[in-house]
Curated annotation (Swiss-Prot):
Catalyzes the reversible interconversion of serine and glycine with a modified folate serving as the one-carbon carrier. Also exhibits a pteridine-independent aldolase activity toward beta-hydroxyamino acids, producing glycine and aldehydes, via a retro-aldol mechanism. HAMAP family: SHMT (MF_00051). It comes from Saccharolobus islandicus (strain M.14.25 / Kamchatka #1). The record marks 226 as: Plays an important role in substrate specificity. (6S)-5,6,7,8-tetrahydrofolate binds at residues 121-123, 243. InterPro entries: PyrdxlP-dep_Trfase, PyrdxlP-dep_Trfase_major, PyrdxlP-dep_Trfase_small, Ser_HO-MeTrfase, Ser_HO-MeTrfase-like, Ser_HO-MeTrfase_PLP_BS, SHMT-like_dom. GO terms for biological process: glycine biosynthetic process from serine; tetrahydrofolate interconversion. Gene3D superfamilies: Aspartate Aminotransferase, domain 1, Type I PLP-dependent aspartate aminotransferase-like (Major domain). The gene is glyA. This is Serine hydroxymethyltransferase.
Amino acid sequence: MSFPKELEKVLEITKAQNVWRRTQTLNLIASENVMSPLAESVYMSDFMSRYAEGKPYKRYYQGTKYTDEIETLAMDLMNEITNSKDCDLRPTSGTIANAAVFRVLAEPGDKALIAPVQAGAHVSHTKFGTLGALGIQHIEMPFDEENINVDVDKAIKMIEEVKPKFVVLGGSLYLFPHPTKELAPHVHAVGAKLVYDAAHVYGLIEGKVWSSPLKEGADIMTVSTHKTFPGPQGGAIFSDGSEVFKQVSRTIFPWFVSNHHLHRLPATAVTAIEMKYFGESYANQITRNSKALAEALAERGFKVIGENLGYTKSHQVAVDVRQFGGGNKIAKLLEDANIIVNKNLLPYDKPENVSDPSGLRIGVQEMTRYGMKESEMEEIAELFKKVIIDKKDVNKVKKEVIDMRKNFLEVKYTFDDMKDLEKYSSKSLKLII
């Protein structure tokens, strides 16, 4: 029997996606990354067909002995590279991780202080997202415009006056670290907890180019496992032995997660092993690339945010493109040239401008994993200039992008061949390859 037309269409769309995004585009979305072929190989396993409610060795289903093993191993590996004591991999996203933490720390009507939206607070921290859905009142801490960050002195005063149930740091437009160490003592002095959303910078934390929030006073840290940490899409929660973690871990199931998408677990474990051996060099190259791209864009006439601070300390670069038509127009124009970024609110934008903000948010972590370095950041900046400033034919620029990608199709910061793999992996892993 030949394939029905509907099936042919599904296969055609999937193939087109794989060819386009894996081989023909510059993927510069700050919240995305790519797994290694090794991680992808264990992702496609029988685990994706199975259920396992509850914690390892305390399940509500039978048939979970290997799930218990791989989940425990993955948590141990994640704790090792994070230098933490507690890890829970059951949240299926960073937002679910946040929801589980927020719900334990506050009741409807309680108050939470968050980093200013101008300083990059994620939507889940706000009344428009998870906090609002839980009925928790969000109050933004004061913004320091010059440093694109929380205003520490004013925030301390607000913490003392408001006495919130918890304070959230971390963000989605996240160029510079939020002041964890400076605020933690004042948060704890009023009996509150400090939550750090490290979704975007987790790979930089375990790669030791970004300070560990848990070592600076955060009570609990939520992360995504697919941004600067290049694993499968999912979430995780970490702590250094806090009572809050125990409470959250007791309630993730059944409040927010039933089955937790078990095929993530071996892929997360593999990525943790990769980052154990290659994570520091990867994180260092990410930050060198983001700085190089920011400088190259500025040299070509773009208004790059944070010039007085060195532009960025993360994987992200933020660019004001109002003079060229705004973020919405320019993001679409770049996509026509196979350069994939997202429009983004900048610190001085009003929230109601979310559909057509001033800026672009650019992330270098995925193209870094494909092996790009500082010289390629210069080339990328030149491609931006051709599309946006020089107004070159986007189809001609698109051809340049495709030609450029031909040299960057192989995932780096992983085990290159079977000889490398044999040094570090068990016999069971070898059988999968």
